[in-house]
């Protein structure tokens, strides 16, 4: 019954019952006091600090400014006083402040300056319920007391400026900040404000050493960092509760930075291809945000590395154009030491390519290095679109002392290298393909800088269809098109590397916004629910197979009120259903750390997903997942909802909580995190399926995306998690794919998710911030469980379907989630 969709007390994946029996859930996850034991909290804090140490990225370090040798420093900027830790601004989480962390490393902080920020905090402006505050609270230079900064220079000649940006929590970042506190007309949220520019100029004109700390989960517009007066810069993401301890250790030199950027940092957001067809909410008289993915697969580094290749006879201005656009490439990150890397072997193992990389620490201090392997696939005009390079694998060394060496074995599954051939140019029909030809196996410092390369030949085309290799590993059916309508809508305007000029001249997509879903007519009728007395309890069925007739017999015992409780979730808990012996159970949401607002419980605040991805450390991410699972158990929650899957199309897009702009990195991090959580005996729910954001929106956003981009980029983390069997619930949201809400899109929720991928778990829709009208359409499309305001949704109204038809839909949904 849907009770299993809601709670996964006995989740059935691929027809086999999960490892947790009813008695465990009934005794462990009961309401009441839930808190972290002291040893668990300490271990989690240590792991959170380690994750931040590995993730922080050194962007700039002129003349080896860092690590610092002088202990007296000045902290400047409002974000040095009120930084963004994550977790919706640390609410309920324990956090160590920048000043506290620096003092622990024996730094001496200018208290006169710090006291000024504490006493002159600008009060946040009020926002509507559910709205994110994007105000910028930097203090104008006119409000600084005369002589304060000159006095600070006398205290120490080192200025450490902190500029902060928060996560967007499922929203687009403001494209114009005029309406927000501290904002400027014509500037977007990820630009420096005038007040911040003035502070930076004041610091650069006074202090001999200027260090910039960027406290943001997504890239900011970074052209200002090219100023030679800025000596060093670090990106710290939203570092979590212990992250400033990690930053202090790096500034002091106790830890060498080792993070690698999970996104491309550009000089000007206007150069991003994903911005071309975006209409911010309210623009041009529209009441919805519309994003047309005309760039296709060419987002992030895939665009810049393909659009602006190294200068040559065919593109003499390539290098200059690239440098004018990209400040820091995907995968970039400096260290206090240096490494020599080379490929020593490439072996074609059939379904997997094995690459051996030899790494030597050639510097004077200890450190860890990440070997990044990219693939350059053969391409000719008329073949399926492919980026010039794509990340194919990565590996990380142990802590290497100066002169120490290590060999890394990096595996590249062929299925991670496939291309979606929408036009069927390889096999005559749309399919996943790997074209024959010479493939460059590239060892790179980042997505732009090649260190070593080898060549691998693929002798014949590999086609994953019914007449070729069949479905991909772990899937039920060979892939077939499911987004034809959207693909056709973008025909002729989607970017092709064969003709960049045509893409540049195409302009925004014309799109007619669909009408809002109307409420069902009063005459639609209502279902009559007569619960049976079959004498069954959930505990009786814990070892039954998914197709056992006892499951529908159990479902028949549900009353109308049971349906409302179990199919519609209002918050972070489920209500008990005595008719089938289901207890009250808690869920937790992962937002930096786990939290359950219903019970008022929080765990440890870990770094933001993007900073976790910057670690490139699979084992570490699995450990973080395990710790999150252990904390969920200690807080008596049996399910964790995770918004980190997905791919960041643009820094300004509503995807600030996902891991990366790269699908392989996002997918691998997602799988490791989920496997860690499951290993602690906790169920997992991935949110944001078929959405731009992992956090549910209001249903006012429209995403128009073609088949190739959807499959190769935005759905890839969900696909890989489903194939690995580490996700128990897959949850979509209210925003539209083309003209259809994702939760009512049968091609997504049934054809792809269940038919092709073979996913047996519950499919859910988070509609808490949206109008949930159209339940029958959602059920018919394959959605089983609804997170929604119960007062706004009535499952017993027939909607557009007749009462009998909807009763069948409910019964089918209940059987699916068993």
Where do the PLM segments sit?
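Glycoside hydrolase catalytic-domain context in secreted enzymes
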Residues: 1-449, 466-818
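Extracellular and select intracellular beta-sandwich modules with Ser/Thr-enriched
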Residues: 450-454
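Short beta-strand edge segments in extracellular beta-sheet folds
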Residues: 455-465
């Amino acid at each position: 019954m849907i009770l299993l969709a809601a709670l996964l007390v006995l989740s059935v994946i691929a027809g086999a019952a999960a490892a947790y029996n009813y008695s465990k859930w009934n005794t462990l996850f009961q309401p009441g006091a839930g808190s972290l034991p002291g040893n668990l909290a300490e271990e989690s804090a240590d792991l959170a600090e380690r994750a931040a140490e590995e993730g922080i990225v050194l962007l700039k370090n002129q003349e080896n400014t860092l690590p610092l040798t002088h202990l007296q420093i000045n902290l400047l900027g409002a974000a040095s006083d009120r930084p963004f830790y994550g977790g919706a601004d640390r609410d309920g989480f324990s956090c160590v402040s920048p000043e506290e962390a620096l003092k622990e490393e024996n730094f001496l902080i200018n208290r006169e300056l710090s006291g000024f920020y504490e006493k002159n905090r600008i009060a946040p402006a009020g926002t509507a319920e559910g709205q994110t505050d994007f105000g910028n609270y930097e203090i104008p230079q006119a409000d600084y007391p005369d002589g304060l900064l000159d006095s600070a220079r006398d205290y120490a000649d080192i200025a450490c400026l902190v500029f902060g940006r928060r996560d967007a929590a499922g929203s687009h970042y403001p494209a114009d900040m005029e309406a927000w506190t501290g904002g400027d007309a014509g500037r977007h949220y990820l630009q420096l404000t005038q007040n911040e520019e003035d502070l930076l100029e004041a610091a650069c004109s006074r202090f001999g050493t200027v260090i910039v700390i960027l406290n943001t989960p997504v890239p900011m517009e970074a052209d200002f960092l090219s100023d030679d007066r800025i000596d060093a810069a670090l990106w710290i993401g939203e570092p979590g509760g212990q992250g400033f301890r990690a930053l202090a250790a790096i500034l002091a030199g106790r830890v060498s930075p080792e993070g690698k950027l999970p996104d491309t940092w550009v000089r000007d957001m206007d150069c991003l291809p994903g911005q071309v067809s975006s209409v911010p909410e309210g623009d041009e008289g529209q009441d919805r945000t519309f994003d047309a993915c005309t760039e296709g697969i060419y987002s992030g580094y895939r665009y810049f590395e393909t659009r602006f290749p190294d200068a040559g006879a065919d593109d003499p201005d390539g290098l200059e154009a690239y440098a004018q656009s990209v400040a820091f490439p995907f995968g970039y990150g400096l260290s206090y030491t240096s490494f020599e890397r080379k490929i020593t072997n490439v072996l074609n193992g059939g379904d997997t390519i094995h690459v051996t990389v030899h790494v030597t620490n050639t510097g004077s201090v200890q450190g860890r290095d990440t070997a990044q392997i990219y693939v350059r696939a053969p391409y000719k005009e008329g073949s399926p679109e492919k980026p010039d390079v794509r990340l194919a694998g990565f590996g990380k060394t142990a802590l290497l002392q100066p002169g120490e060496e290590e060999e890394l074995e990096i595996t590249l599954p062929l299925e991670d290298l496939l291309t979606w051939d929408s036009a069927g140019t390889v096999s005559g029909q749309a399919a996943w393909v790997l074209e024959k030809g010479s493939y460059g196996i590239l060892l790179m410092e980042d997505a732009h800088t090649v260190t070593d390369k080898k060549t691998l030949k693929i002798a014949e085309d590999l086609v994953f269809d019914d007449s070729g290799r069949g479905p991909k590993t772990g899937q039920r059916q060979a892939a077939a098109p499911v987004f034809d309508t959207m693909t056709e809508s973008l025909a002729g305007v989607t970017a092709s590397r064969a003709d960049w000029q045509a893409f540049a001249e195409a302009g925004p997509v014309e799109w007619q916004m669909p009408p809002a879903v109307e409420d069902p007519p009063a005459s639609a009728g209502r279902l009559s629910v007569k619960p049976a007395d079959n004498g069954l309890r959930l505990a009786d069925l814990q070892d039954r197979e998914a197709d056992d007739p006892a499951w529908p017999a159990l479902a028949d015992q549900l009353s109308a009120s049971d349906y409302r409780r179990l199919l519609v979730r209002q918050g972070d808990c489920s209500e008990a259903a005595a008719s089938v012996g289901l207890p009250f159970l808690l869920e937790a949401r992962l937002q930096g750390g786990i939290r359950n607002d219903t019970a008022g419980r929080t765990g440890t605040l870990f770094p933001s997903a993007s900073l976790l991805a910057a670690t490139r450390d699979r084992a570490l991410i699995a450990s973080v997942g395990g710790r999150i699972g252990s904390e969920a158990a200690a807080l008596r929650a049996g399910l964790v909802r995770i918004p980190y899957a997905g791919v960041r199309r643009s820094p300004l897009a509503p995807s600030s909580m996902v891991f990366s702009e790269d699908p392989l990195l996002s997918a691998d991090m997602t799988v490791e995190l989920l496997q860690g959580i499951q290993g602690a005996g906790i169920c997992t729910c991935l949110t944001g399926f078929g959405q731009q954001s992992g956090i549910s929106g209001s249903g006012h956003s429209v995403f128009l995306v073609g088949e190739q981009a959807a499959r190769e980029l935005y759905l890839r983390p969900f696909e890989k998690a489903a194939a690995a069997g580490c996700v128990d619930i897959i949850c979509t949201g209210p925003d539209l794919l083309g003209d259809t809400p994702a939760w009512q899109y049968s091609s997504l929720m049934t054809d792809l998710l269940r038919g092709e991928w073979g996913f047996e778990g519950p499919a859910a829709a988070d509609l808490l911030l949206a109008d949930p009208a159209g339940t029958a359409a959602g059920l018919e499309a394959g959605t089983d469980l609804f997170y929604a305001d119960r007062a706004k949704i009535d499952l017993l109204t027939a909607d557009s379907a007749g009462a009998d038809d909807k009763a069948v839909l409910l019964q089918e949904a209940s059987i699916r989630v068993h």
